[in-house]
Amino acid sequence: VRKLETMQVKIGYPDEWPAARDMMQVTPISEGGSLLSNLLVSMQVSIEDSLSKLGTKVDRAEWDVTPQTINAMYDPLNNEIVFPAAILQAPFYDRNNSYGANMGGIGFVIAHEVSHAFDSTGALYDEYGNYNVWWTDKEMDEYKKMSQSIVDYYNNYEMMGVKVNGDLTLMENIADLGAMTCITSIIGDDAKALDEAFGQMTYNWASEDTASFMMYLLNTDTHSPNKIRVNAVLSSCDAFYRIYDIREGDGMYVAPENRVGIWK
């Protein structure tokens, strides 16, 4: 609870722009500049800015990403979640969307990032961002058992005949499962909102990849492939079975005792 209460939230863009921004001078082509030369200058400014902070107090208000970044993230060292301006738009958020659709869009993303505070890495950091195992031995043993069940669960999924690496994708799978538990708990028994949330969450991760790129992702990405990222989470979500009347023998059916999650 303390970790949640002290979690910092950054939305949109920083209140103050970093000093390094003023140090960066772009030289146009007309004056002899090039993409490479400007990139090298940018890297040098970044290095000098980082070195200048050695021995100084950490500025927790500083942003490590730009507002133009289409992503969201959790930083365990600062115990903060960050939502740049670029992700606060369709398909993740639309002010004209229904409550259910936005819950399945930006709601799922927010819950996913919060869940990272308690994934297999985030769980090792306390509310101040210190590497400090604050769980009791009993709690950690139980957590490891549940984590292993998630590893085993995802190991059973495959794409193009290749099994998902449940260990590689564990952190992201924990966050996805936690996010689904969170948004369905908030929505409750509203079948229409649940249907819209599931549909939007599915739409968010819809993609079409070449075979070679998919093989690359299977071997390197800490996220499960998008299709599995959706189907595996829904197949472990009790609300999914309830509103669509999923039964044994259906394609996405998983027996109740085999459904997984940390916060079920």
Where on the chain are the PLM-derived regions?
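Intrinsically disordered, low-complexity linker/terminal regions across diverse proteins
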Residues: 1-264
